[in-house]
Amino acid sequence: RCCGYKMCHPC
């Protein structure tokens, strides 16, 4: 999952 701008990590 991507959170923010081009920052993909488990949220």
Curated annotation (Swiss-Prot):
Per the record, the domain of life is Eukaryota
The UniProt keywords, alphabetically, are: Disulfide bond, Hydroxylation, Neurotoxin, Secreted, Toxin
Carrying 4-hydroxyproline, the residues are P10
Q: What is its main location?
A: secreted
Q: Where in the cell is it found?
A: Secreted
Task: Spell out the disulfide connections.
Answer: C2-C11, C3-C8
Give the GO cellular component terms, alphabetically. Answer: extracellular region
Give the tissue specificity. Expressed by the venom duct.
Any one GO MF annotation of this record:
toxin activity
How are the domains described in the entry?
Answer: The cysteine framework is X (CC-CX[hydroxyPro]C).
The record describes the protein's role as:
Chi-conotoxins inhibit the neuronal noradrenaline transporter (NET/SLC6A2).
Report the sequence similarity comment from the record: Belongs to the conotoxin T superfamily.
Protein name according to UniProt: Chi-conotoxin-like Ar1311
